Curated annotation (Swiss-Prot):
Gene Ontology molecular function: phosphoenolpyruvate-glycerone phosphotransferase activity
Organism the protein comes from: Pantoea ananatis (strain LMG 20103)
Region (PTS EI-like, N-terminal part): 266-472
Gene3D superfamilies: HPr-like, Phosphohistidine domain, Phosphotransferase system, mannose-type IIA component, PtsI, HPr-binding domain
Catalyzed reactions: dihydroxyacetone + phosphoenolpyruvate = dihydroxyacetone phosphate + pyruvate
Self-association and partners: Homodimer. The dihydroxyacetone kinase complex is composed of a homodimer of DhaM, a homodimer of DhaK and the subunit DhaL.
Record GO biological process: glycerol catabolic process; phosphoenolpyruvate-dependent sugar phosphotransferase system
NCBIfam families in the cross-refs: dha_pts, PRK11377.1, PTS_HPr_family
Protein name: PEP-dependent dihydroxyacetone kinase, phosphoryl donor subunit DhaM
Name of encoding gene: dhaM
């Protein structure tokens, strides 16, 4: 006798498939258990290995248990459950790669008829045949196992190590697919010699990317640089799975209306003058030293962030370090210095502002918001090049910072006892500045536009985070 376990990211989906499958039964010769969703009312979509283990145990009084899964972390949770189970029970369990709905229905019918486990699996794996025949579709032989072609020899590539606990499962993989969608580039995602096109969740799933795996994105074509930048940034952000990706989800309920004196903070980044240089080597050395100094700053900022707000905020500046510690950026700036015989400040500004523009033109709002991080790094490194101090807002009375936008490094340095709120003409609630402000308990509103034109220095302001509104108190 074969019993079934249905594993899905969604409790509603899992229960719905179970309901359909039970319509196939006329007796109790195939029992079905469900392990779907997670016990978090705010974020119910996901899979839980403990639930899977308990579901298997509930129907383990049989010869075999067949586990049907949707995709991504459902497979990982099922595999983890096998490790947690009593070995005697684990020996009975088989994981099935068939499509969840059609495969479960077919497996239920076969199991209820008394078929052995191998037959049940075979029937489930061929469950799409009827639908394909009805639609006149001839399935390509071995389509799912065919890898993409290896990247062209002239393609550029970026390799990252996956830090997501469950690897590239549905949610992080979907963010990758969305970020790369529509780019005019030939893209190949590779892990240990296996190559797929990163435009399909299913293809990415075929790579079975686990935590600590190294994966490489290769790109050629007009949008190759944009694609690689998006991939590298997403990886630095753990593909949106980091707790910081929730941004201001609860900020409206945790920060009340606040008042303070208006303190203007003009974004300190300005385009440097383009001076000619007579010693190219000297300019390259100046730039290299400024980058080293900035990397040291970012390490210090990460330490400060961890001390004040924990590891999730510290990871922001560790990500900045990764973005800056890229020899391609330095090489690109050196090329500008040599070709244009210009100073390091001008060349560095050109290269990083081009990168900032690439981020701003991405379709993914989460990635778009990262352009200000690039400009934060640029400002800090220009200060080192020019021998200038970093300019930060330091009010001495309860204040509301008023600015066009604000750097994450400025927010992490704010005295949250005195800075009651941040009010931006532009900005984004998905920005790292917003995330840090929320951790600090500082009210944050953005996209205020022309409303800020009527505010004068020393005005007393009232910020309502829930309404995303500012007014004179």
């Amino acid at each position: 006798m074969v019993n079934l376990v249905i594993v899905s990211h969604s409790a509603m989906l899992g229960e719905g498939v179970e309901m359909l499958a039970r319509q196939m039964l006329t007796g109790d010769n195939c029992r079905i258990a469900v392990a779907a969703g997670i016990d978090d009312p705010d974020h119910p979509i996901g899979t839980d290995p403990i639930k899977v283990m308990e579901a298997i145990e509930a129907v383990a009084d049989t010869d075999h248990v067949l586990v049907m899964m949707d995709m991504g972390s459902a497979l990982l949770s099922a595999e983890t459950a096998l490790d947690l189970l009593d070995p005697v029970i684990a020996e009975k369990v088989r994981l099935c790669a068939a499509p969840l709905v059609e495969g479960t229905l077919a497996a239920t019918v076969s199991a209820a008829a008394g078929a052995d486990i191998d037959t049940v699996i075979d029937v489930a794996m061929n469950a799409l045949a009827a639908k394909q025949a009805q639609l006149g579709i001839t399935p390509p032989a071995h389509a799912a196992s065919l890898p993409a072609q290896a990247p062209d020899s002239d393609a550029r590539s970026v390799t990252v190590t996956i830090r997501n606990h469950h690897g590239l499962h549905v949610r992080p993989a979907s963010r990758l697919v969305a970020a790369l969608a529509g780019m005019n580039a030939d893209l190949v995602l590779e892990k240990q010699g296996q190559c797929v096109k990163p435009d399909s969740l299913n293809q990415i799933a075929l790579l079975q990317v686990r935590c600590h795996d190294a994966v490489t994105l290769s790109a050629s074509g007009p949008d190759a640089e944009r694609a690689l930048a998006a991939f590298e940034s997403l990886a630095a952000e753990d593909f949106g799975e980091h707790p910081e990706s929730m941004a201001l989800k609860t900020s409206a309920s945790t920060v009340e209306k606040v008042q303070g004196k208006a303190v203007f903070y003009p974004l300190p980044l300005a385009q440097p003058a383009r001076h000619p240089c007579s010693d190219v080597g000297q300019e390259e050395r100046r730039l290299q030293q400024a980058i080293v100094d900035t990397l040291n700053d970012l390490n210090a900022l990460a330490a400060l962030a961890e001390k004040k707000y924990g590891a999730s905020v510290a990871a922001i500046f560790s990500g900045h370090y990764t973005l800056l510690d890229d020899p391609d950026l330095f090489d690109a700036a050196c090329k500008v210095i040599r070709n244009d015989s210009c100073c390091a400040e001008s060349a560095w500004y050109q290269v990083l502002m081009e990168l900032s523009q690439q981020y701003q033109h991405l379709d993914d709002a989460y990635l778009q918001a990262r352009f200000i991080d690039i400009e934060d790094i640029l400002y800090r490194s220009l200060c080192h090049l020019k021998g200038r101090d970093i300019r930060l807002p330091t009010p001495d009375v309860p204040a509301i910072i008023v600015a066009d936008d604000i750097f994450p490094s400025a927010v992490v340095n704010l005295n949250a006892q005195l800075v009651k709120g941040i009010c931006l003409r532009e900005g984004s609630t998905l920005s790292h500045a917003a995330i840090i402000a929320q951790q600090a308990g500082i009210a944050f509103i953005c996209q205020q536009g022309a409303v800020l034109d009527i505010i004068q220095p020393e005005d007393r302001l009232l910020i309502d985070p829930a309404a995303q509104r500012v007014s004179c108190a």
